[in-house]
Amino acid sequence: MNLREYLKTTNLITDGAFGTYFAAKYQTQDIPELANITATEKVKKIHEEYLNAGAKFIRTNTFASNTETLQEDFAEVEKNIQAAVEIARDAVNGRDAWIAGDIGPIPVNGAEDAAAAADEYYQIAKTFAECGVTVLDFETFADLDGILPAIKKICAEYEMFIMVSFSVNQFGYSAAGLSAKRLLADAAAVPEIDAVGLNCGVGPAHMRQILEKAGCPGDKFLLAIPNAGYPTLTRNKLQFGNTPAYFAEKMKELQALGADILGGCCGTTPEFIGEMSLWDGILNKIV
């Protein structure tokens, strides 16, 4: 089914964190995206765990698949993305689930870097499109400016479902100093964008408060993908305090607020998604 049509009648449960879960599960500090080439079964296993937990939507392991983070030329980044798409498809293996091309921020330093990054966002999006991916998830951004040209250009060439989510702190402001209200309004004003919302940055309780204050865009699908909670370093391990049961309870509040797309970011695991999936009402639309 077309994702737009599905979301008109049913909420969507996504996967949870990849990077923090990869680090904890495999006890490594390696960049997770490198495993698309070097450890494909490890990547596939995580996708499968989320699907088995109840996710109907998984994001490719490509959040940091860019030239700056991988320190490779774009030809190698392209291979990394292509491998990630194939791994995700192998994991889905006939299940009724969507695959989204995951695109995170490219680190920049100055106007020249920003211009290069804007072009690379388009090249990344095009690579996904050429692989047959029709859903793109631009996540954890501090503003819209850097990715907007790529979104408009790729949508002029391919039929895409575009998701854009921003990361804000508990006070509702991004690293660029922009409020959640402005970020959501700016993204909602772009015709090419289908879904807007927040991810990372805060736990589910603060995310509900921020979205309630910011207001939810009426003509776009709303996504809410919070962290498990707030991290603490214990015995050299990054830990998040909230339990899967607590997370699921708070996600009910986000669903009641009108969120159409619900999932988890840093610190969440398949157990978090599984706990959320157990509640029958999570898929119901709030009218």
Where are these regions (language model features)?
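Domain-level signal for soluble alpha/beta catalytic cores
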Residues: 1-287
